[in-house]
């Protein structure tokens, strides 16, 4: 194998230098998570993702084939990241309530722009013939983790999921801009993020952000 096998020519991403194909794939998926999360599946093009990743659009198509396959790759990566964060929180060996630690881990994923939103986007695509089954399977995996691995009761698992969906909604609405301006939304944001409101205000997407 040559020293440069598996690397993408510089022309694929002007101004970025050589990068391994695996690293370039990770870069594209991270951009896809952010852009799909903000603009949705229908509203996003492969060119949008390419520009966000500073990659040529033909290379994105060459690597993933279609927008559908790119979305599935981004969704799969997001689900694996989510479940890995839950498992790490559950098994960290530190004292404390497992649900609280997993909840904190979920909030910590806000640093990965678009992760919460792409999950919400996927969960609204149940009628899609390809994405729908994948989204349902992913949601079922999360439920099984909460029940079987984390040992939550059915009621606790439902409440955990409900809070997660509320958090996703607040992030998707880019509601943090209302903090301190609207009393009701300030109260709700404080309730959703009681221990991490400062971080959320700093990290969450805001109105006007491209993603």
Residue ranges and their predicted role:
Residues 67, 74, 78, 102, ...:
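Hydrophobic/aromatic residues within well-ordered alpha-helical segments
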């Amino acid at each position: 194998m040559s020293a440069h096998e598996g690397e993408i020519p510089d022309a694929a991403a002007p101004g970025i230098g050589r990068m391994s194909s695996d690293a370039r794939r990770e870069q594209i998926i991270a951009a896809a998570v952010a852009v799909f999360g903000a603009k949705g599946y229908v509203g996003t093009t492969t060119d949008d993702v390419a520009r966000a990743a500073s990659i040529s659009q033909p290379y994105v198509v060459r690597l993933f084939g279609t927008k559908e396959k790119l979305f599935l790759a981004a969704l799969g990566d997001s689900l694996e990241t989510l479940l890995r964060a839950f498992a790490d929180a559950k098994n960290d060996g530190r004292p404390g309530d497992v649900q609280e630690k997993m909840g904190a881990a979920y909030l910590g994923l806000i640093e990965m722009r678009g992760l919460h939103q792409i999950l919400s986007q996927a969960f609204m695509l149940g009628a899609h013939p390809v994405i729908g089954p994948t989204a349902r399977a992913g949601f079922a995996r999360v439920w099984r983790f909460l029940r079987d691995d984390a040992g939550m009761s059915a009621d606790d698992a439902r409440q955990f999921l409900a809070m997660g969906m509320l958090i996703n909604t607040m992030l998707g609405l880019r509601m943090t801009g209302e903090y301190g301006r609207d009393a009701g939304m300030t109260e709700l944001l404080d309730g959703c993020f009681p221990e991490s409101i400062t971080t959320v205000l700093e990290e969450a997407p805001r109105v006007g952000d491209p993603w």
